[in-house]
Amino acid sequence: MKTNKLVLIRHGQSKWNKLNKFTGWHDIELSDNGINEALKAGSLLKKEKFFFDYAHTSMLKRAIHTLRYILDTLDQSWLPVQKSWRLNERHYGALEGLNKDEMISKYGEEQVNLWRRSFEIIPPQIRLNDKRFPGNDIRYSNIDNNELPLGESLELTAKRVIPYWNKFILPQIKKRNRVLIVAHGNSLRALIQFLNKIDNKKILELNIPTATPIILEFNEEYNSIKWYYL
């Protein structure tokens, strides 16, 4: 029986997660542990008899591959999958590719935590000629450079995630379709904050673990009434 539930999953551990680097829009592979995490997430969903009508993911392979492993485990590899840059991880600007502990040593733990977790604070931004600018990547060639980030706060991340939710995912939910989203820590934080009306200061405390299914339940007005880890 179809229910008003949405499943969110952050990708499995990536090779840069393992090295404690700011990853952002860098297209990094899953680690061996990340692959195992994705398979376990799929097995858990299968055990709980989850079945989906649609899936959404980002343009980054750590999320795409996590979704692939999950759907393989569910024997749902045929499922329609929509990929969008709007579900990409938050762009960490000039921090991308750098080690988090080294940045803490340089700037202090409080400042780095604000860059990582706060709602409105933007990390140091890159320039358009920086190789880390998404406009230099062929996969974003059909997107206006003015829309692509030089570095984002959670607030800026939410400004691209929420329109995608309203245009593509919410209409599917309203038709009582069962939807799976596999994305990233901050794009999912932005969505969870929006759907559950979490205070901007409280969102600082939310850290989403890798490859752990999150269930959101909606009422008949399609408002989120609760969320929890499976």
Curated annotation (Swiss-Prot):
Q: What is its EC number?
A: 5.4.2.11
Pfam families the UniProt entry points to: His_Phos_1 (PF00300)
Which residues does the entry assign to the active site, renumbered to this chain? 11 (tele-phosphohistidine intermediate), 89 (proton donor/acceptor)
Q: Where is the site Transition state stabilizer?
A: 184
Q: State what this protein does.
A: Catalyzes the interconversion of 2-phosphoglycerate and 3-phosphoglycerate.
Q: State the PANTHER family in the record.
A: PHOSPHOGLYCERATE MUTASE
Would you tell me the protein name for this molecule?
2,3-bisphosphoglycerate-dependent phosphoglycerate mutase
UniProt source species:
Buchnera aphidicola subsp. Schizaphis graminum (strain Sg)
Q: What is the lineage of its organism?
A: Bacteria, Pseudomonadati, Pseudomonadota, Gammaproteobacteria, Enterobacterales
Q: Which gene encodes it?
A: gpmA
